[in-house]
């Protein structure tokens, strides 16, 4: 750490710069929820709101908060804009902190994503996971911190869990337990 440069956290700075709004007065979450067709709107509102609060709590607190859920959009077929909708949850100024694609739950790169990104959008991969990778993914979603060595660093260090997970999948048959 440098004594000459202050530590910056662009995600926290973004959230801190937002105006405070009364949710009951503005209804932004409700309007967003209405852009997705679901079988049970009440559960959708409850689970999405909890997940979204978890996203902000994760971003604003290094300890004590981990978003232990993965928001998953399902649909009967491709081309229903599931991944697009999820990607657009990330505000434009924070697009550099959004990862969309396939991950290796047992690889080292995912640790960097968890520590440095706001969102990890697992795109059309949930059905492909074997039991070992499925368990590894569950562990990654719920871990409070990750340990790894950054490129050119000498030592392994611990970093708080920043990222919140989301995913899209075709069909509903992806949970095995």
Please report, for each region that a protein language model flagged, where it lies by residue.
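P-loop NTPase catalytic core of nucleic-acid-dependent motor ATPases
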Residues: 3-119
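Short, conserved, surface-exposed binding loops centered on an aromatic residue
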Residues: 63-64, 158, 175-177
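AAA+/SF3 P-loop NTPase mechanochemical coupling elements
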Residues: 110-115, 150-168
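Conserved catalytic/switch belt of AAA+ P-loop NTPases
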Residues: 134-157
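Short gly/ser/thr-rich secondary-structure transition/capping motifs
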Residues: 100-104, 146-151, 168
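Conserved AAA+/SF3 P-loop NTPase catalytic/coupling segment centered on the Walker-B
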Residues: 118-141, 174-177
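Short, polar loop motifs at secondary-structure junctions
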Residues: 169-173
């Amino acid at each position: 750490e440098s004594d000459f440069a202050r530590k910056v956290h662009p995600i926290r700075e973004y959230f801190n710069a937002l105006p405070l709004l009364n949710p009951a007065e503005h209804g932004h979450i409700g309007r967003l929820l209405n852009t997705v067709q679901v079988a049970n709107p009440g559960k959708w509102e409850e689970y999405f709101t909890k997940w979204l609060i978890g996203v902000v709590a994760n971003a604003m607190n290094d300890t004590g908060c981990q978003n232990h859920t993965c928001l998953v959009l399902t649909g009967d077929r491709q081309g229903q804009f599931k991944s697009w909708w999820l990607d657009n949850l990330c505000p434009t100024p924070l697009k550099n902190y959004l990862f969309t694609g396939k991950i290796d739950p047992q690889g080292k790169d995912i640790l960097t994503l968890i520590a440095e990104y706001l969102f990890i959008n697992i795109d059309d991969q949930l059905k492909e996971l074997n039991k070992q990778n499925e368990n590894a993914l569950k562990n990654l979603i719920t871990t409070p911190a990750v340990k790894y060595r950054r490129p050119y660093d000498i030592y392994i260090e611990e970093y708080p869990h920043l990222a919140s997970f989301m995913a899209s999948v075709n069909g509903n048959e992806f949970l095995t337990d």
